[in-house]
Amino acid sequence: VAEQYFLGTETSERYPLWTRANVGEVFPDPVAMSSFDFAFCNADGIRMSELGWRDAYARIGAFTEDEFDPDNTVILGVFGGYAYLNASVMRIFGERAPGLSAAAIDAQFFGAQPGIPDYEPHPDDASPEAEARIGATFGWVLTTDGLPEVLADEEMVDALRADRPDFGAMGDLELLDWAEQILDEHFRHLFSQHLFVTSLATLPAGIVTDVCAALGRPQDALKLLAGLGDVASAAPSLVMWDLGRRVAAGDSLVEAFDVGLDGLEDRLRALDDEGARGFLEAFDAFLYAYGCRGPNEWETSCPTWETEPNLALAAIDRMRLSPESADPVGRQTGMAVERERLGTEMVGMLAADPETQGQFGAALGSAGIFMPGRERTKTNCIKLVHEARMAYLEFGRRMVEQGVFPEVTSFAMVTFAEGRDLLEDPTGWREVIEERQAVFDEVRELQEPFVIVGDPPPLSTWPRRDAIQVDPVGVGESIQGVPGCPGVSQGRARVILDSHDPTDLEPGDVLVAPLTDPSWTPLFVPAAGVVVDVGAPLSHAIIVSRELGIPCVVSAIDATKRIPDGALVEVNGETGVVTVLEV
């Protein structure tokens, strides 16, 4: 094992607790050099993601700039190659925020965290000034009727896509300059918007959860946060469903899909009947609108639906086999109707306490703004990253042709400055890239610590993922996770470790997955239920599951290793319990 990864950040004495929770879902692999350079830090200092998060906390009023190290990242760290969130900072936000707590932040964002220590107050954690500032912001959260800035950002990134230049006509240096320019101009702002809205979404979610618990109806909290509508990250699944219906209705399309995923896009584009032409027109429109989504989509070197359309076709392939009863629009409508019914009922139950009644009603309305807003702000970031990705891929193709890069995606192994250097003199860069890639590949096979307190353990002590042994769940035994989306379902467990190849998942199966970034969420539609190793109620994919109405349990630790593939299981999305019924 390599003695150390080729990049990383410092730990923090003031904020010593780091976690893979939440960030591990969106950065499952080690961080590549190019992402570290623009998002974390480089020779010039702290970079866009850290700065954007600090901007968000300052805007909320939770922290002042002098509470953070000016020279080192504090909120986002990279240890042993893996991205970590600083749980100490997020817990302090919870403690300072009126009506929240460190425990509430843990529950909403992190779910079950094996090995995480209890919150211990630091003398500087309490801040009456910060509490007052946050309180004023919270007042706005509960009264605003929309997020117009977020919609303006959406228009901006959509315009970038519409005005995408002809990368093939640009020079090598122009490609690098263009990608760096759009990231430098926009990413800090977009990421700050994302964390601003994300942090504030904890308020309505927390109020709804607390009031439901006080009324003796804790199981209804998730139902009141479901069926919100206008969730950007759920939209692709709805369009894919329609595409799947087109396939199911077209004989030539069915035949093309039945052959298998290999070469599927080429077979489809060779068809010339009316149904096939209609499908391809709709599919191309889908790729234009949602082509930025994919596995590990924050990382520019990873594939997306535009760069590898078969990733999207694989999910459509599963949906085409589903019965009409699996229509996500119908499920979403049902969740929305139930949300309205429950909301009216519970507001009525609070008639004797007008203050709480008013706050609860405001929280229900606010949840409908800030939880979809969280997904839209993330989507705005991903759209921007994707435009940079497309420029990088053109650059990578050219460097492969010139013999500088071993792979098109080798751009991920160099910084902006190094990219310019190798254009001036490519001598030796291929060897440097291959050495870094070898370390990246080696570290990707290691199981990183879920929680770090203080300094991270050396890489030499991290076990290989394939060497970790756990006991399988037997008949009648259960795994206790965290409720993600209400509902109870049964089905055969299908352990799918890679969203690139979901062909074992049949309609009515229970999807058991290690994580669920947006490339996984379309697979929720044909599934009877979803079980995930990690996650929490405010995880991105869990918000999507509540829009699609799929019973879901998250933070079911080691479920992909412990639940036998093919076992009949029951998923209880209200209690968070997954039970093996037979094997």
What are the language-model segments listed below?
Residues 4, 9-12, 159-162, 169, ...:
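Protease-associated
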Residues 219, 294, 406-407, 552:
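Residue-level detector of short coil/turn "hinge" positions at structural boundaries
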Residues 216, 403-404, 549:
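Glycine-centered helix-boundary capping/hinge motifs
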Residues 2-372, 387:
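N-terminal, non-catalytic alpha-helical interaction modules of very large eukaryotic scaffold proteins
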Residues 1-12, 17, 21, 494-509, ...:
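Acidic, glycine-rich flexible loop/linker segments
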Residues 362-456:
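Extended, domain-scale alpha-helical bundle/helix-rich regions
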